[in-house]
Amino acid sequence: MFGGIAIILYPQAASWFSQREQSRAIEAAQARLDEPPNNSSDARRAQLALAHAYNDALASGAIFEANANIATGGGSGADSPFVYEEILDLAGGGFMGRLRYDSLGIDLPIYHGTSDETLERGVGHLEGTSLPVGGVGTRSVLTAHRGLPEATLFDNLNQSEVGDSFTVAVLDQVLAYEVIDVQVVEPDQTQAILAVEDRDLVTLVTCTPLGINSHRILVTAERVTPTPVEDAEAATAVPDIPKFPWWSVILAVSFIALATFVWRSGIVRTDGAGEATPEPSESDEITDH
């Protein structure tokens, strides 16, 4: 019984530990950013300026591979000295920023690229699309897994609705976005993620249906300015997920119930074993006549 309950609760427990690690990653990255020389305003402004310059030089485009869990970049930068992996990487480890989508319970670190290793840790920025620093004529594409048994990432992205809001925090800036479009597309419909002139966009991407991954959910949002104060405060606050692990309470209660059952069963067996079997008397013996 206990083993069955443990199996049922495994996805919840694994997701809880994964969320805890993601929150710790955000806190650790923020701590590194608060240390010299990363806490220098000049250093941060220089990185943001470099990111904007990269976006200006970018020939935007991307390719989604059919039947794959991740998106792969097909865009390329114009001839330039930019090193993608080094831009916005003041915190180290490829950490780029933080995505917070409160209504879906998403609070995840954003990393460079979309390798398997990256997407096991959080959200990946699709190389070949704009870096998530905002700007007219840009579209940043952020992608994450959906349906992993050991982690909850973009699992709830299919519940996105027009009018939802989320934030992207990168270095000193917090950008707020409002969802304007939710659609499901074929992997080769790359025009759906191209930058649009005079618009500041972010598109969140994940695979669908679960376990098949033949299509992509695209959640596109447009920048809201200025960033609401409450959104800015939440985006820079200590992560508040995972929530209390109720699964651990269920597991503990189940274990106690099982232990109590085994203990009481042992008492009954012991009591029964202590009763002596009466010896047959002579009068009870069967004789032949």
Segments from the language model and where they lie:
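Solvent-exposed, non-transmembrane regions of membrane-associated and secreted proteins
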Residues: 1-243, 271-274, 278
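C-terminal single-pass membrane-anchor helix
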Residues: 234-289
